[in-house]
């Protein structure tokens, strides 16, 4: 059996549930039902709902074989786990921020000052790398308040849009850490349970598919060479003969190809110009590596 620890609430919960569904492992019964455990469509893969901040230690200590949580939390806990895959969601930027009316312009200006944060380990590493000595003060919330009540001169805190900083009359002067959500594994479990790599492959197939689109089109045989030159495809386009029609004077071919999603606009326009018609652009659910 493989036990996977996933966030039980917060901004990481819904994207995590979605990637399981997209990977063909939908979870039956979510954390909203107040359950601690749930099942997937694979009888050997079970789900453990936990606080995102606790998941690194659950995986490190073997309470879970696999986990999904933010790299900021993994790094902060110093967990001895194997990072298997960047899942590309849940981006969190830890920024160094100071009062907007202060004279601090860069991290080096905070030599000997107090910095409040919910991420003391990441903050210490950040300032040590810069060679700046500061007094790191751990807080458990409302970090933005600390410079205004004399507890700290600056903060290191999560910021996405910067709106919270603006509301609290703070300005970001540097990026201390950038994080996304990772699939992690217990090192012993990874060595002994082959199915963990199957789970990684399933998630990887979803991520690969998000970057690609499937193109289908009809192409006159005389235009095939020009069309093939336009299509970059993963391993070249697939070409199939279309049943001839009494209304068509030229043989028609069906051409299928997988292309990068961000190239769709350019490629479709080029295909039309060299003779392709009836072009369909289809999203892809999974691409197995």
Curated annotation (Swiss-Prot):
| PANTHER family, per database record | ATP PHOSPHORIBOSYLTRANSFERASE, ATP PHOSPHORIBOSYLTRANSFERASE ATP-PRTASE
Cofactor(s) listed: Mg(2+)
Lineage top rank: taxon: Archaea
HAMAP family reported for this sequence: HisG_Long
Its annotated compartments are: Cytoplasm
For this UniProt record, the keywords arranged alphabetically read as follows: Amino-acid biosynthesis, ATP-binding, Cytoplasm, Glycosyltransferase, Histidine biosynthesis, Magnesium, Metal-binding, Nucleotide-binding, Transferase
* Reaction(s) catalysed by this chain's protein: 1-(5-phospho-beta-D-ribosyl)-ATP + diphosphate = 5-phospho-alpha-D-ribose 1-diphosphate + ATP
Q: Which family does it belong to?
A: Belongs to the ATP phosphoribosyltransferase family. Long subfamily.
Report activity regulation. Answer: Feedback inhibited by histidine.
Q: Which gene encodes it?
A: hisG
Q: What does this protein do?
A: Catalyzes the condensation of ATP and 5-phosphoribose 1-diphosphate to form N'-(5'-phosphoribosyl)-ATP (PR-ATP). Has a crucial role in the pathway because the rate of histidine biosynthesis seems to be controlled primarily by regulation of HisG enzymatic activity.
What's this protein's name? ATP phosphoribosyltransferase
Top-level EC class: transferase
GO MF annotations in UniProt: ATP binding; ATP phosphoribosyltransferase activity; magnesium ion binding
